[in-house]
């Protein structure tokens, strides 16, 4: 029977997320995008709603309790993740390419054609890689314990701590494979096991059950695989960078300055702007037909980073003089929020150490105990805490992506989210990133809260099929260590070089 309350929750939560997404666009969008770019805005709203829904489906799966709530969760998970894949690989890139088309050519057909070309390139690369890997490695190998025989000894109880038992019955010797009439049944022997209930089993635990997974499940695996790569890099960086920047921004907050100081700093910013204009013209002159060399693309990414830092410095200068330092209470709120974020990040890292790395026999359940206790006290408390912890990981991914592009390798242009100054291409890029990593974050949370999610459909999907695929299964062994290691390396790097500085552009 379908649980009416769960249906209401399943409808209301996505609706609230969609409304929140609409407010997010209104709050962050650039003035140039007001009353225009409706198609990208619709994609952003749907993408954020889809990502949030996929993460919040985990507590719904728990509440459903293996089908007692009436939802076919195994089917719903497959459907939601296929839709996530379509949005992340096709729809978001298409909307982004369409938005970024050259304004000099106003023909809608030209914009659509350009968007189709870019999207097709991404889709073709993903499809080709998926098909090749599916043909060779689309087989799951599930370790199994094969019970060759099982019998009961009558009137002779066996305790797990008992001494070896000797029997002279030829029948029993034949069952367990003995060559003589006498055989010892040892409860401590991994092949001849007594379970403390008068039963003895002869086991062979080196067998693997092999089966080819469906193409839909393998597509989900590929999305999860790439999501994990991004989550390891950006999530690991963001776990440290998010609280670090919130706290250090308070230290470097705009201070009230006199007029002469304002003019001096404004002059320096103007000189930097003039230099960047010349650099931009040089980069543009070396670009033919929209095609950039690897070196020019790196310079272009460095150029965008320098522009961003210049705009940040100018905004701080305006706040320091024209607004006399701004609203101090907001900086204090961010400062205390940074310590809250620090506590959450430390909580996640500690949970990784004492529960996830030490599995299957963890030192302590830690966050599992918190979520389960709150869930037992009142179901929504556990869901709220789970939602906050999982969405915090999404924020860390977005922050880590921005920090990565700003400070490290400049492999792709930065797409910062700034209040009242965020273009739609930045929205679309970050939504695509959130969609891809939402799959890996759900997988991560399934393992992190395994005591909370042990009977769920998503746990069976990830732990049975996805985690046991050929070749790829070795990747799942190291990713938890990789996230922790990335966070430690980021902490060391940020303490050595805490300030963002413009990169040197070699044109």
Curated annotation (Swiss-Prot):
<keyword id="KW-0812">Transmembrane</keyword>
<feature type="transmembrane region" description="Helical">
    <location>
        <begin position="75"/>
        <end position="95"/>
    </location>
</feature>
<feature type="transmembrane region" description="Helical">
    <location>
        <begin position="427"/>
        <end position="447"/>
    </location>
</feature>
<dbReference type="Pfam" id="PF04791">
    <property type="entry name" value="LMBR1"/>
</dbReference>
<feature type="transmembrane region" description="Helical">
    <location>
        <begin position="335"/>
        <end position="355"/>
    </location>
</feature>
<feature type="transmembrane region" description="Helical">
    <location>
        <begin position="476"/>
        <end position="496"/>
    </location>
</feature>
<comment type="similarity">
    <text>Belongs to the LIMR family.</text>
</comment>
<keyword id="KW-1133">Transmembrane helix</keyword>
<feature type="transmembrane region" description="Helical">
    <location>
        <begin position="4"/>
        <end position="24"/>
    </location>
</feature>
<dbReference type="GO" id="GO:0016020">
    <property type="term" value="C:membrane"/>
</dbReference>
<feature type="transmembrane region" description="Helical">
    <location>
        <begin position="120"/>
        <end position="140"/>
    </location>
</feature>
<dbReference type="InterPro" id="IPR006876">
    <property type="entry name" value="LMBR1-like_membr_prot"/>
</dbReference>
<feature type="transmembrane region" description="Helical">
    <location>
        <begin position="378"/>
        <end position="398"/>
    </location>
</feature>
<keyword id="KW-0472">Membrane</keyword>
<feature type="transmembrane region" description="Helical">
    <location>
        <begin position="215"/>
        <end position="235"/>
    </location>
</feature>
<feature type="transmembrane region" description="Helical">
    <location>
        <begin position="42"/>
        <end position="62"/>
    </location>
</feature>
<protein>
    <recommendedName>
        <fullName>LIMR family protein DDB_G0293610</fullName>
    </recommendedName>
</protein>
């Amino acid at each position: 029977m379908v649980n009416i309350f769960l249906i209401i929750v399943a409808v209301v939560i996505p609706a609230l997320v969609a409304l929140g997404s609409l407010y997010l666009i209104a709050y962050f969008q650039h003035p140039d995008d007001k009353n225009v770019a409706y198609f990208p805005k619709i994609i952003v709203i749907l993408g954020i709603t889809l990502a949030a829904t996929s993460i919040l489906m985990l507590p719904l799966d728990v509440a459903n309790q293996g089908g007692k709530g009436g939802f076919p969760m195994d089917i719903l998970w497959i459907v939601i993740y296929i839709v996530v894949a379509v949005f992340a690989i096709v729809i978001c890139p298409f909307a982004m390419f369409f938005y970024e088309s050259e304004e000099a050519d106003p023909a809608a057909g030209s914009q659509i054609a350009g968007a189709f070309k870019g999207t097709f390139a991404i889709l073709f690369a993903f499809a080709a890689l998926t098909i090749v890997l599916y043909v060779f490695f689309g087989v799951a190998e599930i370790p199994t314990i094969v019970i060759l025989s099982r019998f009961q000894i009558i009137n002779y109880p066996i305790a797990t701590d008992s001494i070896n038992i000797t029997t002279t019955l030829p029948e029993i010797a034949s069952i367990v494979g003995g060559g003589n009439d006498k055989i010892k049944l040892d409860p401590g022997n991994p092949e001849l096991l007594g379970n403390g209930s008068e039963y003895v089993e002869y086991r062979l635990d080196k067998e693997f059950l092999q089966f080819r997974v469906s193409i839909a499940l393998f597509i989900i695996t590929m999305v999860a695989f790439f999501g994990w790569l991004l989550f390891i890099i950006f999530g690991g960086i963001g776990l440290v960078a998010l609280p670090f920047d919130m706290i250090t921004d308070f230290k470097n907050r705009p201070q009230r300055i006199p007029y002469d100081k304002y003019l001096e700093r404004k002059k320096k910013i103007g000189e930097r702007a003039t230099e960047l204009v010349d650099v931009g013209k040089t980069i543009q002159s070396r670009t033919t037909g929209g095609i950039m060399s690897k070196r020019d693309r790196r310079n272009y990414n460095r150029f965008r980073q320098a522009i961003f830092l210049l705009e940040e410095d100018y905004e701080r200068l305006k706040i320091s003089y024209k607004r006399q330092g701004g609203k101090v209470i907001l900086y204090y709120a961010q400062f205390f929020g940074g310590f809250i974020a620090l506590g959450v990040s430390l909580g996640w890292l500690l949970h990784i150490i004492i529960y996830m790395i030490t599995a299957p026999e963890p030192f302590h359940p830690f966050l599992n105990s918190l979520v389960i206790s709150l869930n037992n006290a009142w179901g929504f408390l556990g869901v709220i805490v789970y939602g906050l912890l999982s969405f915090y990981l999404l924020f860390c991914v977005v922050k880590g992506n921005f920090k990565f592009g700003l400070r490290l390798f400049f492999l792709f242009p930065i797409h910062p989210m700034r209040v009242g100054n965020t273009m739609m291409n930045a929205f679309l890029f970050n939504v695509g990133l959130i969609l891809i990593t939402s799959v890996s974050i759900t997988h991560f949370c399934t393992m992190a809260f395994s005591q909370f999610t042990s009977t769920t459909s998503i746990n069976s999907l990830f732990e049975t099929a996805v985690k046991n695929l050929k070749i790829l299964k070795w990747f799942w062994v190291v990713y938890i260590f990789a996230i922790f290691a990335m966070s430690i390396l980021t902490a060391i790097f940020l303490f050595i070089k805490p300030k963002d500085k413009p990169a040197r552009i070699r044109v």
